[in-house]
Amino acid sequence: MFGEFAFRARVGYGMVMDFDLSKVSAHQTYNLLIGLIAPRPIAWITSLNLEGKLNAAPFSAFNYMGIDPPIVAIGIGNRPGPGVVGKDTAQNIRATREFVINVVNERLAEAMVFSAIDFPPGTDELELAKVKTVHSSFVKVPRIAEAPASLECREFSTIEIGRSRVVLGQVIAIHVKDEFIDPKGPYIRAEELHAIGRMNGLGSYVKTRGAFYQIPRMTYEDWLRTEAERK
């Protein structure tokens, strides 16, 4: 079924399909990884080109990598077609070294998906989607007004890897709507934010509304006490 790059092996807990990724196409590898690394947070990135034209596009190869300094990482591929031409977002970040990550909730989901259309370079996706923006505090790139939260970023570095790249951005400011902030921490009221995540396949997403549950985390001292009580 999968040819020479995959085979089944029996282990103590059942049958396992093993894939040799050195023999798997990029598309097949993509299908496997996005199905396993899920759900993924969505970075709805706004950026400007050198002429000041706004671009917006979503990316789910995204997460935070550290807090001192605060670093986020985004994997950005190339535009469809032959050659290695980075997507508008990657080109804009490299040119201006600034971008904004906007958090996507259920209310913004359809507009976010619309902005993923492969429009010609220089197209303002947010204008077409009738999504308003507001000025950022430290970067020239505007942020999405309706986003529950936004992260102003400056490019820390970009790592070119094969036909794609990983952009490391340093977060220099965070904007969060009042209703999603608990001032005691400050903490994010994540249960009320209703963020969405990306799953496998085109158009496949997951809601976080009503999906939270708690698993008590045991300390080493708790574990020692529990073990002593069992004896």
Where are these predicted regions, by residue range?
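Basic, polyanion-binding surface patches
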Residues: 12-231
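N-terminal amphipathic/basic-hydrophobic helices that include classical n-h-c signal peptides
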Residues: 1-16
